[in-house]
């Protein structure tokens, strides 16, 4: 979780100070439910029935970090006295990153280490080719919960409606092009 900076504004609309918005337990609970909903929907559509081909779907995918960026992150956090494992399976690397993020909790260097760690990650993107979501460690993940804010969520809702009504799978190339367009925005 990256801190959200807010501005305090005077009567004339001029910023007079900044502060960090603290996420409340209710916010965290809603976020967890959104993650579960996104995961459930992706898994429900992504897992094909026995003997059937999976239907075309829009996934939110996130690849493993670039090894070179991980090495740079490791060298950076070493200056603060932390060690980061950069070799091994993707699960090993993920555990190492989580261990690092736990170690910096409530330390003066927390924000900078979290930001540099985030920059070492690949960017998540939309695709009809599911590779899972590395950052969340989910095999299936989509964006489903904000159809009024994100067009990919709207695509997911349309596909869900189509499939719930017994419709056939859609043209994968067309949807992959739409995903690529959304990734470029």
What do the predicted segments below correspond to?
Residues 1-185:
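Append "with occasional cross-activation on large, charged helical scaffolds in nucleic-acid assemblies
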């Amino acid at each position: 979780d990256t801190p959200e900076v807010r501005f305090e504004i005077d009567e004339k609309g001029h910023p007079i100070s900044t502060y960090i918005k603290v996420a409340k337990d209710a916010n965290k609970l809603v976020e967890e439910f959104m993650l579960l909903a996104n995961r459930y929907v992706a898994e429900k559509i992504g897992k094909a029935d026995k003997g059937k081909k999976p239907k075309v779907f829009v996934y939110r995918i996130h690849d493993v970090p670039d090894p070179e960026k991980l090495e740079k992150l490791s060298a950076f956090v070493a200056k603060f006295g932390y060690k980061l494992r950069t070799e091994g399976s993707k699960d090993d690397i993920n555990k190492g990153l989580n261990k690092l993020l736990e170690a910096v909790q409530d330390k003066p260097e927390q924000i900078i280490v979290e930001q540099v760690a985030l920059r070492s990650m690949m960017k998540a993107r939309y695709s009809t080719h599911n590779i899972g979501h590395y950052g969340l460690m989910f095999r299936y993940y989509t964006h489903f919960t904000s159809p009024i804010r994100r067009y990919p969520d709207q695509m997911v809702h349309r596909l869900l409606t189509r499939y719930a009504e017994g419709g056939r799978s859609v043209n994968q190339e067309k949807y992959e092009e739409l995903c690529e367009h959304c990734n470029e925005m």
